[in-house]
Amino acid sequence: MKERVVYHTGKWIPVSKAGMHIYDSQSFFGDGIFEMVRTFNQEFFILDKHIDRLFRSANYLQIPITKTKREIIDLCKETLERNKEHFPEGEECRLYINASRGPLPMYSEVFDRVEPTFIIDAWPLSKTAKSLGHFYKTGANAVVPVQRQIPARLLENKVKNVSRMHYQVANLEVANFNSDRDVMPLLIDEDGFVAEGTGANFIMIENGKIVTPELRNLLRGASMMYIIETLAPQLRIEVIHKNFDLYDVMNCDEAMFTGTFVNLLPCNRLNGRYINDNLKENPFGPITKKIADKWSENVGVDFIEQMKDWYQDTGKDGGYLSSLLGDK
């Protein structure tokens, strides 16, 4: 099987050659933006929403993107098509789109011309998600690290930027909590209100209603917005945005993480303690299950069984955080 190829700033190159230049603004400042997109049955899911957010992030950070939305969509499809032998039936794609302002002008003498960096990479989703399948059996244990969410007054959280250091610090802290096999970090803000996970949004169910944190201090995740804008109306579930703290989480009916890879992942514990005795045997509460089932129906894939199958195929018990941090 030949090597996968990556679209890298106007060229198609082997993935092994697709490095970030040492003088790129991302290397110096974490000055870049990105999007992660997945497929269902090898069709991109809400790709247009992700690209819209990419343009909003680029506009805020004044990162030039020289391509139109239509051109980017076509490039995404071409990236998958050029790598189709790596995506047999039953496999899905995790698409990574990255943009930066490119090499810093002070190093322009090194280059024939300085231009913005733009990368699209297609990676088998099962390899990314293989450590996540057991969460659908056990539920996630949300563990709160010392590391807080960076407040929007210091860094705009609605921008999906590559500056992920505070997330990684939280991951490192939480990975030391007992076993990292079933834990997920849950960040709170400087006022003690729940913000988000390090790679997913957090939602709780209270009195039959979907409750999300206020949207001012977190990334407006595409998956969370799909629940809010599409699934909730379809299921006639009311959505409330409000500040809530760990006390509220400990007394809610159900909870979940939601993000591109996991779609929806049930959370039944907070700092090792079950938030509801009814979630001990089955981490899916009735509303969480209803949302998950409707999601699967809409996309034509039982994503929960898909994730379980990928996990079973690995034959490993490696935790989610281990896949991000390696051996500490």
Outline where the language-model segments fall.
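Short, flexible active-site-proximal loops enriched in glycine and acidic residues
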Residues: 48, 85-92
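Helix-start/capping segments and mature chain N-termini
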Residues: 1-67, 71-78, 82, 106-328
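Short, internal active-site loops enriched in acidic
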Residues: 100-105
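ATP-grasp fold ATP-binding core
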Residues: 92-99
